[in-house]
C-alpha cells in the first residue's frame, strides 16, 4: 500500500519526502522494523519513539509518522508530521 493511502485519513501538519512509497508493514517498535516499514514514533510514558527514528531508518524504515520532525532527515525517507 502507498504511504499516501495509509495516512489519508489523518490530520497531517507537514509532509517531507515521497508519499508514493510502498509500505509493507507498520511498526511502533524500532527493534521490529524491517525493510519497507512505516515507523510510528509514539511518545509513551517509558520511552519516546522519536528517540528511535534513526534506528528505525537504519533497519529499513522508508517512512516515519511523528509529532515532531527530526532535526536531521534522511532524504530517502518520507516524514509525516501529525498532531498526535
Task: Tell where the protein language model's regions lie, with residue ranges.
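N-terminal leader/targeting and accessory segments in enzymes
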Residues: 1-84
